[in-house]
Regions:
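Short beta-strand segments in beta-sandwich/barrel cores
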Residues: 19, 28, 45-50, 68, ...
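Polybasic "coupling" helices that flank or enter modular domains
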Residues: 102, 106-175
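Glycine- and acidic-residue-biased ligand/ion/polar-headgroup-sensing regions
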Residues: 35-49, 65-66
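A short beta-loop-beta micro-motif enriched in histidine and acidic residues
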Residues: 16-17, 25-38, 56-57, 75-78, ...
Length: 222
């Protein structure tokens, strides 16, 4: 996360602000902090979860190595960042990191870029949940994962998903049964292949993007 050309004293200053977290799969990287935090996910994968009344949970976003993640302090809802696989992360107090970053344009640029990416993904997700069918939602999810963690395999793309189908369902506002049914339909249509519970091959990215309701002019290449 830090600029590669950062002077030693600058590097030490940033490192002093953060605390290292090494967490096993299922563990809490950040949980209901009293202040807003920014988390750099150095390795692994995680989910940002919001908690509402009556023990209701919502998977807000999935995150992967290299992401800078904003975890709000409890307000209308409480939040936690939970590891989907063994993960290493550095947790910063958001206000302090932002204050120090004002003196270091490269770091501030990294934070702004991360904020822009998060805003874009949030807008896309609001469209997916608000306007799209179950089939389109699942196709959108697969395309999104392909862009972020997909492994090219010729004209195909392989996904090794760290999240459960329950997590996917919660993220998309669907049931587990609907997720399984839609994956089965996409498999039957020749758009994907599945292996076990976590490996999915995307066989036709252009057709899958069309299935997701993407505009034709948008590129479906990884």
């Amino acid at each position: 996360m830090l600029p590669s050309v950062a002077a030693d004293e600058v590097l030490a200053h940033f490192e002093a602000l953060g605390r290292l977290r090494i967490v096993a799969s299922g563990g809490s990287i950040v949980a209901e902090e009293s202040e807003d935090t920014l988390v750099y996910l150095a390795s692994g994968a995680a989910k940002l979860v919001a908690f509402a009344s009556q023990d209701r949970e919502q998977v807000v976003a999935f995150h992967f190595a290299g992401d800078l993640i904003s975890v709000p302090a409890p307000r209308a809802h409480a939040y936690a960042l939970l590891a989907l696989r063994a993960s290493e992360a550095i947790v910063f107090p958001a206000d302090e990191l932002l204050s120090v970053s004002h003196e270091h344009p490269a770091m501030m640029g990294r934070i702004i870029c991360s904020a822009y990416t998060s805003l874009r993904r949030s807008r896309e997700k609001s469209i997916v949940i608000g306007r799209k069918t179950a089939r389109e939602r699942v196709a959108c999810f697969l395309i999104s994962m392909a862009e972020r963690i997909g492994l090219p395999e010729g004209n195909r793309c392989v996904l090794h998903l760290p999240m459960s189908r329950r997590d996917i369902a919660d993220s998309l506002g669907l049931t587990i049964e609907t997720i399984s049914r839609q994956l089965g339909d996409l498999r039957g249509d020749g758009l994907i292949e599945t292996s076990g519970r976590s490996t999915i091959r995307l066989l036709d990215l252009a057709a899958l993007a069309a299935c997701a309701g993407h505009l034709i002019k948008q590129s479906s290449q990884i």
